[in-house]
Amino acid sequence: MIKTLKNLLKQDKKRYTVPRKVQDVIPVRRIWKDGIFQVGSRFSKTYQFTDINYLVASREDKEQMFLAYSELLNSLDSGATTKITINNRRLNRANFEQSILMPMRGDACDVYRREYNQMLLDKATSANGIIQEKYITVSVWKKDIEEARTYFARIGADLITHFAALGSKCTELDAAEKLRVLHDFYRQGEEAAFHFDPQDMMRKGHDFKDYICPDSMEKSSGCLKLGEKYCRVLFLKDYASYIKDSMVTELTDFNRNMMLSIDVVPIPTDEAVREVENRLLGIETNITNWQRRQNANNNFSAVVPYDMELQRKESKEFLDDLTTRDQRMMLAVITMVITADDKKQLDSDTETVLAVARKHMCQLAVLKFQQFDGLNTVLPIGTRRINAFRTLTTESLAVFMPFKVQEVQDKGGIYFGENAISHNLIMCNKANLLNQSAFLLGVPGSGKSFSAKELIAFLILDTTDDVLICDPENEFGALAAALGKETATVIHMAAGGKDRLNAMYMVDGYGENNPIVEKSQFIMSLVEQIDKAGVGPQQKSIIDRCTALVYQDAERTGKPATLCDLRNKLLEQPEEKAKEIALSLELFTTGSLDIFGHESTVDLDKRIVVFDIHGLGEQLKPTGLLVITDTILNRVTLNWKKGKRTHIFIDEFHVVFENEQSGIFFNSAWRQFRKRNGYPTAITQNVEYLLDSVQASTMLSNSEFVVMLNQAFSDRAKLSKLLNISDEQMSYVTNADAGCGLIKYGSALVPFINRFPKDTELYRLMTTRPGEGVFGSGNAS
């Protein structure tokens, strides 16, 4: 027998004692606050790792992931046993309702909150409803806890590095988190009741097992009853010669509470080589003896029997894997436990799982009279009581790939649809990201406006955050007026209109550094919108000088500075170019766009402000967009000082990058939004125009949240290159239905489906399809 295996079996050897109570069945002797458990004579620690997009990856990417996972398996310590566990946990409805549904507020908007909550409940009911968690548990024999801590500190750092190479995040579980995993399995349906306080436990003299164990355990030859639930432990008895990498995914793609564990015992290479050489020597001896017998019978042309030849060939290949291909010998045990509400359901589910295994030419079998041992083996405790070992190489073990698809289910998140692969809800909390900048991209008719309105509706109904919207197509006013009631104002910007905005308005703290310099940059952008020849160095100097003089006069007189004041100051200057700039600004002061040249006449202090620039026409929209962005920047600065979050939505975002100066100003404003607790969202259908600008491309690539709906062919190619998305993943934005596409959330890429029920008042407010809803502007000002 291999020395490592012999030592392992010796360490695991334990005298059987009849359990006198339910707690005795749980094999954990002691726990420490940092998550280390003592199980028998060994110490164990569990780490949780996140899923990666393996199923939707390209063939090349899958190969890279496979090699990276193989490298992780190769790095496992031969002195320890490693258990990889996939835990399917059903979403608790009570917890779901508490964490996701909107609370009623007793106002006129409760009717919309009920509609939204009902939509979420319907989606959750029709969805998979299973949360899949993945753990890796390392157990090792050490003399004392200090040695164990030192060992796990080193192993933990190694695991985190290797999982990071895969694109997965690996984190340690402390005692409370690990006990919660066990509690949620032993006491299914009572997940919300878990509470563990070590100080309180010691003060009361309780055992930690009291907090997790079921009320009762009953065993029979082929199943267990834990409280009111039935469970059955299976093990992989027979392996196929060739196994697909989708086998584990298919076994766990099951809408039930279940666990699957792979126990791995790595064998040191020198022992493995010695073992295989001995086996090969035995085979060669058998072949030699067989040939000697044939020669004794004068049969000198006899061919070596096929089974002997096959044994020799496989042994040589195995030895070659160990010595030249850096493979390791691994001993593996695969076990799984399925649970059900009654025995009949358990039998039916067992047959379903057995059929999946048969499909892959493997045989799963029920552990007869070993159910308790099997249960303790499959749970992420750190013990192994089943010795149905199968000898594998690193590559053949890596075929049991635990990865499937990334899920985004953040606590306190906002609903963005359901995962197109797992059908679980996608809940995104942008506060968890490195930055909160967002882009919403898609061709006309792909559902951009609807997606933006759905997010705005959630923010208005469920938060107290301010919402500022730049609306070039008169689409958002009705929604804001209906949901905002007294807290919303819709500003109609049109040539000769009564609503005016002061383009020179500037709050205390405006800009990143020098506010006068920032405002000068804004004025240059404004002039450039009129004079397509651009702003030269001489004009820049004049604008900078006059802007400073205007604000000095405003500070002295106590009157707000306006574009009229700036134009008058320009006319006072001796340079001829100053007169030219003044002539350019005439449009905004005494011309048809004087709505930006005087003091503001609108209420900018409301919680929801919609800037409707539809009336400006196509030629003047970029100018209106610039002034509104500057106004929004002032509001974000004020909110930042109050400690309030602001959400900014800017439609037709691409137009501001048609000119150099306006692009520079907008890039600066975008940075300031992020730094001042602003959550900016850019919406555009012209992705190609956006990507032609270096600044806009940089903003897009640096954004942590990007929603991609159906994309044109040329846009797909550019987005794929910019965001490093595979062709397989880009297929989700190719001829996609409205509301379907791909979400880039931090490092995660999740295909999604988002269809809102049409028989609701919210749908009527959000849709832009002719004849289906309210398409136009409300007036809540």
Predicted regions and their residues:
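A short helix-turn-beta junction within AAA+ P-loop NTPase domains corresponding to the substrate/partner-engaging
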Residues: K485-I491, Q695-M708
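P-loop NTPase motor domains
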Residues: I52, R59-S78, T85, R89, ...
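Hydrophobic anchor at the beta1->P-loop junction of P-loop NTPases
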Residues: L440
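Extended, folded cores of ATP/NTP-driven motor/assembly subunits in large transport
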Residues: M1-F403
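Structural recognition of the conserved hydrophobic beta-strand(s) that form the central parallel beta-sheet
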Residues: V467-C470, F673, Y679-Q685, M708
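Conserved lysine of the Walker
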Residues: K448
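Post-Walker A helix-loop "phosphate-sensing" segment adjacent to the P-loop in P-loop NTPases
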Residues: F458-L468, E486-T487
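Hydrophobic positions on the alpha1 helix immediately C-terminal to the Walker A/P-loop
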Residues: S451
